[in-house]
Amino acid sequence: MPIYLLSDEHPELFPPPERADKSGVVAVGGDLRPERLLAAYARGIFPWYSEGDPILWHSPDPRFVLSPDKLHVGRSLRKTMARGIYEVRYDTAFRRVITECSQVPRPGQTGTWITEEMMEAYVTLHEAGFAHSVEAWAEGELKGGLYGVSLGAAFFGESMFALAPDASKVAFVTAAERFQGWGFQLIDCQVETEHLARFGAENWPRRRFLSALARAMKEPTRRGKWTEGAAADP
């Protein structure tokens, strides 16, 4: 199956995700300008490539997804959350979160896929109100968190990190519960991990994911910084 080369002049144009090859790659090239990233996410496509390689755009089949209303939290983690060890904040340290995520060792990887180019692109998306960080703080220090993109009633998780036990888990669960209150319909986890499977994430066939995503894209986007005041339930 052919891999499509993206146009420099039309960042909104992507081939149908169904045309991805067996590895999930649907297109190559282009750039990471906000218009292109937002167009990609709205179609169920995301960038994932190594430093020095061309930009590869993915739409894997199956897709690992968590429905916020199916979130599962184990007893031990609930106890940790009840103890109030971590304070969860939104969008107060986005650049620090993505930088920490870029430094997390990954099994089988010698480098990072979160390149400088990638970091700057998502910082730009954050400044535009589409990319967000969820942070776990303790004693005034950042201990863990995650970042991702929000469009419509969907959150596209990109990466997470932890510098202390359960910090990223507390951030993730707190965010998922917040998303449920907001009426979000799905959290895109991209590819399967044992870590997220424990929270109830499942593999969906691409067709099911794209159908659910199309419904989620019909809802308004919570654009802007999710600081404490902005993040309050309506």
Curated annotation (Swiss-Prot):
Keywords: Acyltransferase, Cytoplasm, Transferase. It holds the Pfam family Leu_Phe_trans. It is an enzyme of class 2 (transferase). GO terms for molecular function: leucyl-tRNA--protein transferase activity. One of its GO terms (cellular component) is cytoplasm. It is found in: Cytoplasm. InterPro entries: Acyl_CoA_acyltransferase, Leu/Phe-tRNA_Trfase, Leu/Phe-tRNA_Trfase_C, Leu/Phe-tRNA_Trfase_N. SUPFAM superfamilies: Acyl-CoA N-acyltransferases (Nat) (SSF55729). Disulfide bonds: none annotated. It catalyses: N-terminal L-lysyl-[protein] + L-leucyl-tRNA(Leu) = N-terminal L-leucyl-L-lysyl-[protein] + tRNA(Leu) + H(+); N-terminal L-arginyl-[protein] + L-leucyl-tRNA(Leu) = N-terminal L-leucyl-L-arginyl-[protein] + tRNA(Leu) + H(+); L-phenylalanyl-tRNA(Phe) + an N-terminal L-alpha-aminoacyl-[protein] = an N-terminal L-phenylalanyl-L-alpha-aminoacyl-[protein] + tRNA(Phe). Its EC number is 2.3.2.6. Its main location: cytoplasm. GO terms for biological process: protein catabolic process. The keyword Acyltransferase applies. Functions in the N-end rule pathway of protein degradation where it conjugates Leu, Phe and, less efficiently, Met from aminoacyl-tRNAs to the N-termini of proteins containing an N-terminal arginine or lysine. Belongs to the L/F-transferase family. This is Leucyl/phenylalanyl-tRNA--protein transferase. It comes from Myxococcus xanthus (strain DK1622). The gene is aat.
